[in-house]
Amino acid sequence: MHRYLLFGQDARAEKAVMANAGWYTFLKDINYPYGVKDMPISEDRLKWFLSVKGAIMLGDEDTDPNDGSLRNDKGAKEQGNNRFQRGIRYFERNVLIADSLDMPFRWRLQVVKNAAHENSKMIQAAAPFLLEDT
């Protein structure tokens, strides 16, 4: 979801849930897919991306570094050992970027208790966020 928001051609989303991604595209000067070096992202798009009402949702038990669906190449491992670590680092990095641009940051970090890489638990956690007023 975060890559769609960052690189997509429309700006209609009012809210977005980004849950348990295996790796992230950081707003750093490193090559895609782990960064945005040489990628066509306008300043307006970057500001819109950071101002969307978003939620990074992470299962507190999604910590298996050997999960079969977890990307484990060098670029991914530099983000953290597991989905939980990677998500926290991605959120924290975006907080710093929004602060450096002196702009509002409307994302939240939500840790889902007793959840590993389980879609059903993430959907239950996402529903209240998606249904609340923007």
Where are these regions (language model features)?
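Short glycine-enriched nucleophile-adjacent loop
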Residues: 1-9, 124-127
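Short, flexible loop/turn elements at secondary-structure junctions
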Residues: 5, 20-23, 60, 111-116
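Surface-exposed acidic, glycine-flexible loop patches that form ligand/cofactor-binding
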Residues: 7-10, 43-48, 99-101, 134
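Residue-level recognition of the N-termini of beta-strands and the immediately preceding loop/turn
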Residues: 13-14, 52, 103-108
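The feature captures the conserved acid-bearing segment of alpha/beta-hydrolase catalytic domains
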Residues: 14-96
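C-terminal catalytic histidine-bearing segment of alpha/beta-hydrolase fold enzymes
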Residues: 91-134
